[in-house]
Amino acid sequence: MLHYRSVPEAEAVLQRNLTTAEAAWLRYSAGTHDLWLYFHNIIFLLVVYTLAPLPLAVLELTRPDAIRRYKVQPKVPVSLSAVLRCYRNVVCSFLLTVGPLQILSYPTVKWVGIRTGLPLPTWWEATAQVGVYVVVEDYANYWVHRAMHTPWGYEKIHHVHHEFTVPVGFAAPYAHWAELLLLGVPSFLGPALVPCHITVFWLWMVLRHVEAIETHCGYDFPHTPTKYIPFYGGAEYHDYHHFVGRQSQSNFASIFTYCDYIYGTDKGYRYHKDLRAKIR
């Protein structure tokens, strides 16, 4: 909650003119409780989850032949009913699991120092912080995901996510409620170690969500912007993990592939790629 009642008051305290973004933020957030600002995160996740996978899903339903050559597993269709069931279950999980978690974790958010006031962070500051969050989340998520593929972790929790042997964007957050809670820890770990402004926190969560949807889209498009990010896994890389399914001990990477390479959990994938290359 901002304690300034007007732009002139804020400028007097900060001893400078507010930027356009800061003035807009003041008008929006002044008098708004920090809990409600933090709760925006679940709203953003629902909007992104609904809209981000939609164009590709519509294209796959209306013009499948136009993009079939880019589909990683072209012979295994995903029905509309399965996608709708997935969407319904994920929305329920967001509202019944992630939503309450947002409220319960609010004291922790305040304790670690995620702020809502002025000044707003610079673009360089926001970029550096998100960069740290990516690295921290990627490493921590690798081990959580790998633990989910132990016999107990898979049987009790992770098998739900692997119901989709052919990934689709809408299935990115499709998982057991306990897995949603566990995977929230790596995502929050970066902001806990390097506290940020709430707007950067929103940005990080949205980017992470979009990345997960892209990774699960099931299509390997040649000119996707993420193709130019070094060590980025992407859809084709993660698709192999779902293709193998229950027995998969490969490609646990969340975003980048370096952990799989360092710890030797990409050997099956590399063998699979080499075999496909020889067949072609």
PLM region spans:
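Hydrophobic alpha-helical segments of membrane proteins, primarily the transmembrane helices
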Residues: H40-V47, A128, V132, V136-Y139, ...
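Hydrophobic alpha-helical transmembrane segments of multi-pass integral membrane proteins
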Residues: I43-L54, V91-Y106, V132-V134, L182-L189
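Membrane-embedded alpha-helical segments that form the functional core of polytopic membrane enzymes
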Residues: P121-Y142, R146, M205
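Long, highly hydrophobic alpha-helical transmembrane signal-anchor segments
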Residues: L2, S6-I42, V90-A126
